[in-house]
Curated annotation (Swiss-Prot):
Pfam families from the UniProt entry: Pantoate_transf
Active site residues according to the UniProt entry: 186
Enzyme class: transferase
Protein name, per record: 3-methyl-2-oxobutanoate hydroxymethyltransferase
Binding site for Mg(2+): 52, 91, 123
Pathway(s) this gene product operates in, as recorded in its UniProt entry: Cofactor biosynthesis; (R)-pantothenate biosynthesis; (R)-pantoate from 3-methyl-2-oxobutanoate: step 1/2
GO biological process: pantothenate biosynthetic process
Superkingdom of source: Bacteria
Subunit structure: Homodecamer; pentamer of dimers.
Record keywords: Cytoplasm, Magnesium, Metal-binding, Pantothenate biosynthesis, Transferase
PANTHER family: 3-METHYL-2-OXOBUTANOATE HYDROXYMETHYLTRANSFERASE
Reaction equations catalysed: 3-methyl-2-oxobutanoate + (6R)-5,10-methylene-5,6,7,8-tetrahydrofolate + H2O = 2-dehydropantoate + (6S)-5,6,7,8-tetrahydrofolate
GO MF terms held by the record: 3-methyl-2-oxobutanoate hydroxymethyltransferase activity; magnesium ion binding
Length: 269
C-alpha cells in the first residue's frame, strides 16, 4: 500500500489481512496521548497500540499490572481522537482480560463505545480461546498476544524468552480459530516466530521475534530515547529525542537565569 493510498481510507482488519496476503510489512507503534498519536498517524504508521505499557513508560511503574481499565479508556480516548487513518488497538489490562467472560466483553465494548478505537489486545493463546470467541461474537475485534506475556510476570518469574515452539504454534492456531484477526508474538526465537507465521493465515506482529513475521511493533518511547533505565535488546534508537528535550530544557533554564529570555520581541508593550 502506497502512502497516498493509506491517506484515503482507514486501516481495518481487512486492510491488515490484505497486507499480510501480499507480503507487505505492517507497522505498529505505541501511543498514549493526542499529539504523539497525531504525529505517528501522519507519518503513516498502520496500527497504533494504546498499550498497558503506559504503566511503565509514562506512569513510572516497574510492571504493567497497576494499570486500570479506566486509565486505558482515558488514554485511548486521546489516541482515538488523533488517528484519522491508523487502526487503533487498546490493551485489556490486568485483570480485565482474565476475569469472567462477561466482564471482558463489557470492557471490550467500553473501548469501542467510549474511545473511537477499533479493537482490543488480549494476552494469552489457547487458554483464552473461549474469551476471544465471546468477544468477537459480541462484535469486538481481538488481537491475541502470545509468547512473553507481561501480565503473567509473576507466574513466569520474570520476563523470559519463550522457546516452546509447539506450544506457541498451538496458542496461535487456537487464537486464530477463535476469531483473532492478528497474533502479536513477543520475545520468541526467530525460528519460533517463523513457525507461527507459517501455521496461521492471519497476520503476525512481532516484538523481539525476528524478521519472519507480517509486521513489527515497538514502544515509541524506546525508539525515541525517552525511556530511562533498561532498554530491551530487540529495540532500536531511531532518534535521540530524549537528549534533544534535555538540551532544550537546559538552554531554557540557562537563558531564564541569564535574563535573556524573554527578549523584547517575545514581550508585549
Amino acid at each position: 500500500m502506497t502512502e497516498s493510498e493509506k491517506r484515503k481510507s482507514r486501516i481495518t482488519t481487512r486492510t491488515l489481512q490484505r497486507m499480510r496476503d501480499r507480503g507487505e510489512r505492517i507497522t505498529m507503534l505505541t501511543a498514549y496521548d493526542f499529539p504523539t498519536a497525531k504525529i505517528l498517524d501522519e507519518a503513516g504508521v498502520d496500527v497504533l497500540l494504546v498499550g498497558d505499557t503506559v504503566g511503565m513508560v509514562v506512569q513510572g511503574h516497574s510492571t504493567t499490572l497497576p494499570v486500570t481499565m479506566d486509565q486505558m479508556i482515558y488514554h485511548a480516548e486521546m489516541v482515538g481522537r488523533a488517528a484519522d487513518h491508523a487502526m487503533v488497538v487498546v490493551d485489556l489490562p490486568f485483570p480485565d482480560g482474565q476475569l469472567d467472560l462477561l466482564h471482558s466483553v463489557r470492557c471490550g465494548a467500553r473501548v469501542l463505545k467510549e474511545t473511537q478505537c477499533h479493537a482490543v489486545k488480549l494476552e494469552g493463546g489457547a487458554e483464552q480461546a473461549e474469551r476471544i470467541e465471546a468477544m468477537v461474537g459480541a462484535g469486538i475485534p481481538v488481537m491475541a498476544h502470545i509468547g512473553l506475556r507481561p501480565q503473567n510476570i509473576h507466574v513466569e518469574g520474570g520476563y523470559r524468552l519463550q522457546r516452546d515452539i509447539e506450544r506457541l504454534v498451538a496458542d496461535a492456531k487456537a487464537a486464530e480459530a477463535a476469531g483473532a484477526f492478528t497474533v502479536l508474538i513477543e520475545c520468541v526465537p526467530s525460528e519460533a516466530a517463523a513457525a507461527i507465521t507459517d501455521a496461521v493465515k492471519v497476520p503476525t506482529i512481532g516484538i523481539g521475534a525476528g524478521r519472519d513475521v507480517s509486521g513489527q511493533v515497538l514502544v515509541t518511547h524506546d525508539i525515541l530515547g525517552l525511556t530511562s533505565g533498561y532498554t530491551p535488546k530487540f529495540t532500536r534508537l531511531f532518534a535521540d529525542v530524549g537528549n534533544t528535550i534535555r538540551e532544550a530544557a537546559k538552554s531554557y533554564c540557562d537563558e531564564v537565569k541569564a535574563a535573556s529570555f524573554p527578549s523584547d520581541a517575545e514581550s508585549f508593550e
